[in-house]
Regions:
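Short, acidic/charged, Gly/Pro-enriched secondary-structure junctions
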Residues: 1-26
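Helix-start/capping segments and mature chain N-termini
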Residues: 2-3, 21, 29-207
């Protein structure tokens, strides 16, 4: 990373992606041959415009079907198919369900809703990655006095929500401006979650 600083102007927004992969093995990769690569590339942070989402026909896998407890590259095609389907309908992202028909997450990030001042996010049932950003946002909101609940969410819950937003490594906290044909405002809970996270990240980065 230090060697590449001269190639990047100050203030450039970068995405840093650490990756582990097995360099040997055929059907069964040789874990002892695991190698590491750090992928750094320029990509701007999302703006305040938010993103649109629709419900996907593709479902998230159960943990006995795929390594859902890891950020594994083999899981990406599942989300990519959902995003392609959403794009063909004119949406930016997709809301994916689990095998029971409950909300799992967005194709690329965890999902949150706000209704009557209460923030809810799907309970960790093993069908999605309980990511670092999700856990951080959850802790920050609770510490700030917000009523936050981890529970099963249905499509009807999302459709009736006052706000919908996401959390993830790339966008951090980003609000949803439209679910299907219903427009949504950048509401107070999404703004609060975004500010809490960015304030935390800035204060941590200065240490």
């Amino acid at each position: 990373v230090p060697a590449g600083r001269s190639q990047v102007p100050p203030g450039t927004e970068l995405y840093i992606k650490p990756m582990f992969y097995c360099a040997d093995g055929f059907l069964l990769p040789d874990a002892d041959k695991t190698q590491f690569v750090l992928h750094v590339f320029k990509v701007p942070m999302p703006g305040d415009q938010g993103f649109s989402a629709c419900f996907s026909s593709f479902a998230r896998s159960w943990p006995n079907m795929a390594p859902t407890d890891a950020k594994a590259s083999c899981l990406y095609p599942n989300g990519q198919r959902a995003i392609r389907e959403a794009a063909e309908k004119g949406f930016d992202n997709a809301i994916m369900l689990d095998g029971d028909g409950n909300i799992a997450e967005f194709a690329t990030s965890n999902l949150w809703i706000a209704k009557d001042g209460v923030v809810s996010t799907p309970a960790d049932n093993g069908t999605f990655l309980n990511g670092i950003t999700r856990r951080r946002v959850l802790a920050l909101l609770k510490a700030d006095g917000v009523d936050v609940r981890e529970r099963s969410l249905t499509r009807a819950d999302v459709e009736a929500a006052d706000e919908v937003f996401s959390s993830g490594n790339y966008g951090k906290v980003v609000h949803v401006n439209r679910v299907e044909d219903r427009a949504l405002e950048y509401g107070p809970m999404a703004r609060r979650a975004h500010k809490l996270y960015m304030d935390y990240a800035e204060s941590t980065g200065k240490k």
